[in-house]
Amino acid sequence: MDFGSLETVVANSAFIAARGSFDGSSSQPSRDKKYLAKLKLPPLSKCESLRDSLSLEFESVCLEQPIGKKLFQQFLQSAEKHLPALELWKDIEDYDTADNDLQPQKAQTILAQYLDPQAKLFCSFLDEGIVAKFKEGPVEIQDGLFQPLLQATLAHLGQAPFQEYLGSLYFLRFLQWKWLEAQPMGEDWFLDFRVLGKGGFGEVSACQMKATGKLYACKKLNKKRLKKRKGYQGAMVEKKILMKVHSRFIVSLAYAFETKADLCLVMTIMNGGDIRYHIYNVNEENPGFPEPRALFYTAQIICGLEHLHQRRIVYRDLKPENVLLDNDGNVRISDLGLAVELLDGQSKTKGYAGTPGFMAPELLQGEEYDFSVDYFALGVTLYEMIAARGPFRARGEKVENKELKHRIISEPVKYPDKFSQASKDFCEALLEKDPEKRLGFRDETCDKLRAHPLFKDLNWRQLEAGMLMPPFIPDSKTVYAKDIQDVGAFSTVKGVAFDKTDTEFFQEFATGNCPIPWQEEMIETGIFGELNVWRSDGQMPDDMKGISGGSSSSSKSGMCLVS
């Protein structure tokens, strides 16, 4: 075994051990006690002033932010008058993700418990007109059945109950978490593992957040290389877009900080490798996926594209290499470096961007284009997943870009026998040359794609909630990445000096913790549950007063954990 191979084996072993400690295959996540001790809720004297600087909109505080939602629901749980609204909210969410055969019974339970004036949890705040519609006759079980009730419930909770919450201890606890969230957590909070790959401006490596044990991927953008290649604008665009998107089908940005040499983006780690690797390298004698597996990934990609397009973001770089698998076998789209955000009032954009073979005809011809280019790329990606080759060139075929452009614009696509009629029809609808006729994002949704016969057996509600079993689960003992010596190293950048403008850009880029992913990490790793300590008598907890846990013996018997 040569030194390079030995280096890979050692690095893989350390990475797999860390991964096992976090994903549950070992008993306790690996946490650094020194950094764990720094995750401490502050006394109110340090954080109460945040009340004046935070955006206190109901939707943001109580629905979008994970810790905010938990604390608001705990507040509702503590007051009997709010229990009907809370339980209805939770039961509707439960109904929306239930198996089809369980929905009828759950629907009847909702009608009986919350819409009957004689019921203990009758929701008297609901408009009589909404209630009457559900009492007119037999209820037809369907997706979104109780959305009017949910919207009315949240509208009610956003009024007087929300104002009560803002004056409660639970909101003060939220301010404590927001203060902690804002504390700088930079390079020293992370332990680097092996290099996973290379980006345009630096390496991508696995890393571990020391305090929680959570694993991430750290994309390092070398400052000198960025400046030399005039990459500042592209890097900032990618970072700002990553901060805007929060979907289980798109990699999330959790932290952004700088080191002496690099700008660092700490993002969701996808341990299963990319789709291209699985198409061609896992079973080389029979490349490609069975159709059900390809359809599962396609459905998850559709959910990711819909999230981007609802936020007016054109992806422009969908391809198998940019679709990554997580530990459980679910996929997310990644690498938003070529994405562009449409401005208010702007319906289309222009510019040559993407990967040869995946770019839509209108883009190749220099025309203006919209989100439709991403659905053309989806068609190419689905075709490649099933056929193990692209629709416009055979695997390994050397094709000049001019010829490839001609094929995409002018030639029909041929489908091998691997395609069912439904998958062929779906691909053809995506690979339509005319963007106006192409299947895609319409009326702010991807519902027309969801309604295609190809997905007739797919439960979209459960897919979107992350409740469906993926068709393939990556091996937890395998590192789906090139050997370290095959990743390659960057050459040293010389002759680049930084000035005040550069320093200001670096500081603007390094914004620290991203609220929603950071809060998800605190909940997922158990930190929230460990610090969310309340007195059973309802009085102010010691941490809010600035009293450490070990210094107040009088209140020990009155403490309880609420996660």
Curated annotation (Swiss-Prot):
Its EC number is 2.7.11.14. The modification Phosphothreonine is found at residues 8, 492. It comes from Homo sapiens (Human). It is linked to Night blindness, congenital stationary, Oguchi type 2: A non-progressive retinal disorder characterized by impaired night vision, often associated with nystagmus and myopia. Congenital stationary night blindness Oguchi type is associated with fundus discoloration and abnormally slow dark adaptation. Changing residue 21 to E: Not phosphorylated by PKA. ATP binds at residues 196-204, 219. Residues 58-175 form the RGS domain. It comes from the Eukaryota. This is Rhodopsin kinase GRK1. Residues 1-15 are annotated as: Interaction with RCVRN. Keywords: ATP-binding, Cell projection, Congenital stationary night blindness, Disease variant, Kinase, Lipoprotein, Membrane, Methylation, Nucleotide-binding, Phosphoprotein, Prenylation, Sensory transduction, Serine/threonine-protein kinase, Transferase, Vision. Retinal-specific. Expressed in rods and cones cells. The modification Cysteine methyl ester is found at residue 560. Residues 561-563 form a propeptide. Inhibited by RCVRN, which prevents the interaction between GRK1 and RHO. Inhibition is calcium-dependent. Inhibited by phosphorylation of Ser-21.
